[in-house]
Structures are given as structure tokens and as C-alpha cells.
Amino acid sequence: MTPEFDEEVVFENSPLYQYLQDLGHTDFEICSSSSPKPEKCLTTEGPQPPPTRVLQRQGILLKLTETIKSWTFSSQHSKKDDLLHKLDTGFRLDSLHTILQQEVLLQEDVELLELLDASILSAGQPQQESGHLPTLCSLATPNTWDVSLLFAFISLLIMFPTCWIVSSWLVWGIILFLYLIIRVLKLWRTAKLQMTLKKYRVRLEDMAANSRAFTNLVRKSLRLIQETEVISRGFTLVSAACSFNKAAQHPGQHLIGLRKAVYRTVRANFQAARLATLYMLKNYPLNSESDNVTNYICVVPFKELGLGLSEDQISEEEARNLTDGFSLPALKVLFQLWVAQSSEFFRRLALLLSTANSPSGPLLTAALLPHHILCDVTQGLPHAHSACLDELKRSYEFFRYFETQHQSVPQRLSKTPQKSRELSNVHTAVRSLQLHLKALLNEVIILEDELEKLVCTKETQELLSEAYPILEQKLKLIEPHVQASNSCWEEAISQVDKLLRRNTDKKGKPGVACENPHCTAEPLVRPALHIEDRDPIPEEQELEAYVDDIDIESEFRKDDFYHLSQEDRERQKREQEESRRVLQELKSVLGFKASEAERQKWKQLLFSDHAVLTSLSPVDPVESVSNSEPPMNSDTEKVNSNATEEETSKPCAGDKEDSRTEYVCDSPTEGPSKDTSADTGLLLPGAEETMCHQHESEAKSPQAAAAGATAPPTPRDTLQLSIKQRLARLQLPPEFTFSAGLAAEVAARSLSFTTMQEQTFGDEEEEQLVEGGENEVEEK
């Protein structure tokens, strides 16, 4: 061989030879690496026939021994390798067939699989019997080795009659029994391995089916959300409730629960499929073409994808902000990402389970079977698919079939009362109205779009005239929906009118009592006297109400008391005791009790004539005055009724005209005597000093008044002293407390808002004297 051709020589089994074979080049010269030496030996030493014959004989013997050895010692290993190869190939073909039949791959991924490994697509064709997993019957059939051993055993028995001796049967039986046990154990292991592969194939089929069902359910959910938005927006525009821009401001308010469920489930499934694909790329690498990162979405960072897709969990508020309130465009983008990622996962799994990547016969072991790879790759992906599918299905069925589920109630009309049947009729009418309006809205939207096209286009008059009959036909198609909507509306109105009439008839029947035990009949309220809002309400009325001892414990509900804590109960008790103490001090300072007639006179004095819209009746003055009192005085008079009766039955001695006298009792004794005098309202004779101030006793000295001397009433010919001057004449005892002084000051201020004028009944001369006194006051 000349040196100029050395560059074109390729040695067999060299790296260059293997590389060229992989590239498909076969048109080159092949030279064996051991060929030059024998050629050189032959040319230099010449032919030697005896050594050649020896070498030939040795080669034949070696080949014969190797054949016998391989047939005797390696038959079991070859059988095992063949069985594992059948299981491996059958599982791979069944898995590829499942992936292709479930239609979980996009068209782009199918084309990429055809480019990378065309044998994968052939697995999707109807498979032959050799392509499936071997069945248990095929695994249990005896092979050539078993048959040969059986024939050898039978021939041995025939050739040696001595083997038929009874003593040798035990030995042959034990040998045969051990062989059967070994054979059954091997068959059981093979069957167990076959069942495991079948179980993982079913799991892969379920995972692919769940992925496809989840994709279809997300597509239905998005369609339902879109239809709801379009219908609600259309009804808003038709009803002219608000503008289009205002209607489109918050589209996420429709089916917000379904939107959240779609976002959560799609996000979880996307993350699980992404992690599984990255795990395959990292732990099970293939060739450079299959592992090219430009063909995978899973290598794109989360930040570039957006929409809250990250490994960390995010709150609902963050997801709402990142998706613009779970808007429909954001959910559609997320759905497209999920579809691409799911298809990418199954594409990579198909490449990994391809028969081209199956290990060769000697290297194939039970640990390298593809079901281990499938279990390691998927891990928690099937559980994520099934959980997300169940969650989204519940949410979708709730929002889609909520009314349908309620519509199933009229199926039991025979067992339901008349009220339920009528309500179901109303529901049926409203449901029919909704369906007709939905169909009507779709037709109107299509017609509106066509009219916009006709308006915007610059067509000739002839083409426009041809379009008019088409518009007329479409309007006629809309007419049945309008008529059906009107009939459904009238039916619903009539059913509701029947229910209303029946309800009013039941309410209008006499003798229908209220069955609620907590319902109490309201008493008839007597018409109150209306007072003009020009003069302030006298504070004396409030003081009189405060002075009276109101039974707070009786008005306090015991039911509410048990709901209070221990601290609240103690606090209320302290407040009640403090209120009683203040009331007793007020009574000791302002300790006077007036009779009903006296109260009537005080009310007439406090309220001017122009403040009352309706005049007081002279026949029943007590009743008319009691009607004109505020609500707080009515409660006070009920409490003081007993004290009033005692005062009217036992008047003060020497005082014949109680209407002209005001008693102010100041006792020098301690608090208990004050409380007793305040509770009874009686004057203590002789034990305490009593100051009796008459309205016409101006000439009387203050010393006599302080001594407690009482003078008989004289004719009222003097001017009336003001209330502030009379209160100033009071000599307060040293035991007068701060709160009592404050109450006295408040009483003085409240009584100084008007000039008191006395009125008596029955004596005309006294009335004339009163008028004369008023004139003198005006002159001064």
C-alpha cells in the first residue's frame, strides 16, 4: 500500500470507523489492523502446511467446546435475558401507545418526535401480538431447554432399565420435585414482574387521561366565564343601566369562585409538570438533539413567565393583583402555558421510553426495566393531576349545574306540597325566559356585527339593496325568541300574582293568631299633646323624675344578666348603688312631695298658655295635665302614687290651702333620718325645724321662719318673691354634702327660667287680687 493513500485508509473497529458508521458513510476502504503482519510473514517465510493444519484443528475444537459450553451453561442466562427483553419492549411499546392514543401531545411536539425518533410514532399504530406485554400463559409455556431435559430424562430411563428399581425412584422423585419447585419460583417472579409492569402502564394511562380531562375541563370553565361576561355585559347594555365602560370595569366579579379555582389548579399542575420535566432532563439525559434546551419551556425562569408562577406559595391578594383580578386574558395565558408544559412533559417521557433507548441484552437487568424510570420521574404528578381535577370539577359543577340541581326538585311533585309546585312553576318560567333571552342576545349580537360591517363598507347601492332582504329574514328569525320571551315573562308574572293573592288572603282572614310565643301585642297609644318647639322643656320635670326611686332591678332583665361576666356584674351593682345614693341626697335636698292637684297646678304654672296647642280641660284637670307630661314623669308618678295618697289624706295642720304652700324640709339629723323623710314625704313634728314659706308672707321676718313658726294664711296682697330669693333664704345645715349642694344649685337654676305665678280655683276675689299683683309688678 503506497504512502499517498494512507489518509484514505480506515481501520476496522477504530474510533474513526465507528464515527463514520454513525454518520452513515460506508463508501470508504476498510483495512484490518492484523492483516499486514500475516501478509508480511507469508511473503518472507513462505508457505508452511503443517502449522496451518494444526491451527485449523485447534480452531474447530475451540468452536465446538464454546458451542457446547454456551448451550449447556449459558442457556438459562439467555432465557432470562430474552424474557426481560420481552417485558422491557412490551412495556415501552404499550406506554408509547398510551401516550399517543390519549392525545396529550401538541402537533408541534408530534412533529418534533417524528424528527428525533420516528419509531415512537409507529408505536401508536395497532400493535401486533409481539408488541404487547407477554401474558401469563406465554410466560408459563415450557421452552426448548425444558423440553430437551424432559426428553433426556425419558431416554435415560429407557436406556438403563436398572433405573426402574424401586429404590432409585426416591432419588429421581426428589430431583424432579426440586426442579419443579425451582421452575415454579422462577415463574412466580416473572409473573410478579409482569403484573408490576401492567400496573404502572395502567397508572400512566390514568395520568394521561386525567391530564387530558383536566385540560378539557379548564377549557370549559374558561368558556363558561367568557359566556357569563358577554351575557352580563349584553344585558347591561340592553337595559341601559350603565355605560359599556362601567360594565367592563369589573369583569372579575362574575364567577369569582370558579376563576380562583381555575387559577389554583392550573398553577399547581403547571408547577408539577415543570418539576418532572426538569428532573428527566437532569437525571436521565439523552443525546444532544433531544436535550436541546431551546425545545423546552421548563428552562424558562419563572420571572419571565409572570402570573404569580413561582416555587413559593402566594396569597390570594397577591394572585389577584398579579392576574388583574383573575381576569379572563390572564387565565387564558396561564392555560396556554399549562397545555404547552403538559405536552412537553409527555414528549420527553416518550423519548425516554422509546425502544431505541432500551439497553442491550447482557446489560438489561430487572433494576433497569422502564417502570422504575416511570416511577422515579412521575412521583407526585398523578396525585397532583387527580386532586386538581377533582377540585376544579366540584367548582365547575357548582357554578354550571347549580340551577339544574335545584331544577331536579320538581321531579318529586307528587310528594311536595302545593307551594313547592307553584314555586317550581315560577322557576321553570324564569329559566325558560333566561334561555330565550340568551338565544335572542346571541342573534342580536350577530345581526349588530353584520350591520356594522354594512355601515363601514363602501358598497354600491345595488349590493346594499341585496342585503336588505337578508336583514329582513334575520329579523324574522329573531321574532320567535321575542314572542317566547314575552310568553315566559307573562307566565312568570301570573304565577307570582297567584302567590301574592294567596298570601294576602291568608293574612286577611280573621281569627288568625300569632303562633310565635315571643310576639306581644302592642297596646293602644293615647294621642299625645303636641307642644311647639319654642320654649325649652323645664328641667324641673327631669329633676322630679330623677328624685323618684325607680326600681331598676325589676326592669333589668335577668336573661341579659347571666350573659355578663363577673366584672360587668360587679360594675353594674356599684353603679346602681351609686345611683341610689345620689337619689337619696337629691331627695334630702329637694325633699317635697306634691299631690296630684299640686302637680296639676305646677304644670299649669310651668307651661305658658301659648305653648300648649290644645287647652287643658277644667273638668278633668289631672288627666289632661298627666297627658301633657313627658314619658319620664309617667313612670315617676307610678312609683310615687302611694306617697301622694298619704299626703292628700294627711295634710299639714293649720294649712287649709295646700295649693299656696311649698314645703322645704331641712333636718339636722343624720343620713338615715333624711332617707326616711325622703321616702315617706311627711313632716316630722317637733323633732326637726320646719320652715314654712308662704307666697304672701313677705312682711314676716326671716328669724321667725328659721324658728319654724307657722302662721295662718293671710290674704295675698303682696308681691310674689322670686324662687331664687326664697332658695337664698334657706339656712343649710353643716352636714350638707357637696353633691347635695350641687343638686340644689341645679334646682335653683332650673326653677329660675320663669316667674312663677300662682293660680287657685273657685275663688274669684283671689283671682282679682292676683291680677292686681301682676299689674303692680309690671309697673315696677
UniProtKB/Swiss-Prot annotation:
Membrane association type: Multi-pass membrane protein
Region (Disordered): 620-718, 757-780
Alphabetically ordered keywords of this record: Cell junction, Cell membrane, Cell projection, Coiled coil, Cytoplasmic vesicle, Developmental protein, Membrane, Nucleus, Transmembrane, Transmembrane helix
Biased segments, Basic and acidic residues type: 647-663, 690-699
Statement: the UniProt record of this protein carries the keyword Coiled coil: yes
Subcellular location per the Swiss-Prot or TrEMBL entry: Cell membrane; Cell projection, Stereocilium membrane; Cell junction, Adherens junction; Nucleus
Gene name, Swiss-Prot/TrEMBL: Vezt
InterPro entries on file: Myosin-bd, Vezatin
GO MF entry, a single one: myosin binding
Quaternary structure note: Interacts with USH2A (via the cytoplasmic region); the interaction associates VEZT with the USH2 complex at the stereocilia base. Interacts with myosin MYO7A and the cadherin-catenins complex.
TM spans (from-to): 140-160, 162-182
Positions with biased composition (Polar residues): 624-643
Pfam assignment, any one: Vezatin
Coiled-coil spans in chain: 430-467
Family to which this protein belongs: Belongs to the vezatin family.
Tissues expressing the protein: Expressed in developing cochlear hair cells. Isoform 1, isoform 2 and isoform 3 are expressed in testis. In the seminiferous epithelium, present exclusively in the acrosome of spermatids (at protein level).
Designated name of the protein: Vezatin
GO BP, one annotated term: chordate embryonic development
Biological function: Plays a pivotal role in the establishment of adherens junctions and their maintenance in adult life. Required for morphogenesis of the preimplantation embryo, and for the implantation process.
Effect of loss of the gene: Embryos die at the time of implantation because of a defect in intercellular adhesion.
Species this chain originates from: Mus musculus (Mouse)
Record's GO cellular component terms: acrosomal vesicle; adherens junction; glutamatergic synapse; nucleus; plasma membrane; postsynapse; stereocilia ankle link complex; stereocilium membrane
Biased composition (Acidic residues): 761-780
